[in-house]
Amino acid sequence: MIGRAALSGLLVAFAVSCGGSGAGSVRTTRSATIAAVIKGLDNPFFATMRDGLVATAGQHNARLRVDAAAGLQDTDGQAVTLESSATQREDCYIVNPINRTNLIHPLSHVREGAPIVNIDSPIDQNAARAVGVKITTYIGTDNVAAGSLAADAMAHLVPRGASVAIITGIPGDATSEARARGFREGARGRFDVVQTIAADFDSERARLAAEDRLRANPPIQGFFAVNDQMALGIAAAVRAAGGSSLVAVTGMDGIPDALAAVKSGAMSATVAQYPYIIGQLGLEACLAAMRGKSVPANVAAPVQVVTKENVERARANFPQPVDPFHDPLARLLKG
């Protein structure tokens, strides 16, 4: 894996030769460059995504520039970064927006015909089309389905009819909302979601929210956090209250600290995403599109539930999935 030292703003350069004459194919008069603008590397999920982008660029001898936002709420800064990248007239853009609309305006300024690959957090397609921005493909987790998987895991951890709380991220964040919606849908007839609390994807805020909820009525028997950083904060609150064996804590993302917490019993489960694979698929989609290949409009990234039963394999395989994953884009890069 690429080291955790910040690569934001650095050009990871490899020789590249990309042919193809289809719509949006890369110019062949010079080395082609792929620009990636992602969320903040203060979250290990996005640092791992960066690693997947960089490693895959190396495997395919691609020329890649990666820029990251200063933090998970740096919407304006991320947009300015992409605006600057757009002036460089890169040949393909990979974007991981902080919200559904903050990158639409700068995307309207990218070179005509340059493919735009949207990874992880979806762009508002209607708003994008309104200003002439065409998204080549979206690659990411089906977050509603992932939330439902988290509910399945919770149903095996708490009694029927148990009281469970959801800890969400930043209000209005599409990913957070989709995960919470999937969890609520999966909870029906199995356990009761009695409260939803926003903690802005922040571990400390989630810890404080969990402390408050643990003191309230009715007694809580489970927490679902829409990301692992918040789940770790909740786990700390549950442990401090002496309820580790009584209150289930499930998260989502499968970051290394969460896998360690599942192994120790501090967390009950996490629905692992694979940001390394999302980065890999994003880079592959750019290469395929630049070669004039037809890339699917939507590519689902893998998700897998990690519990005490399979956490050792999950840790051994990280950042790859627990179980084998079929890469749907690999065939487009052959030959």
Predicted segments — roles?
Residues 18-335:
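A residue-level marker of the well-folded mature domains of exported/periplasmic proteins
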Residues 1-16:
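Sec-dependent bacterial lipoprotein signal peptides
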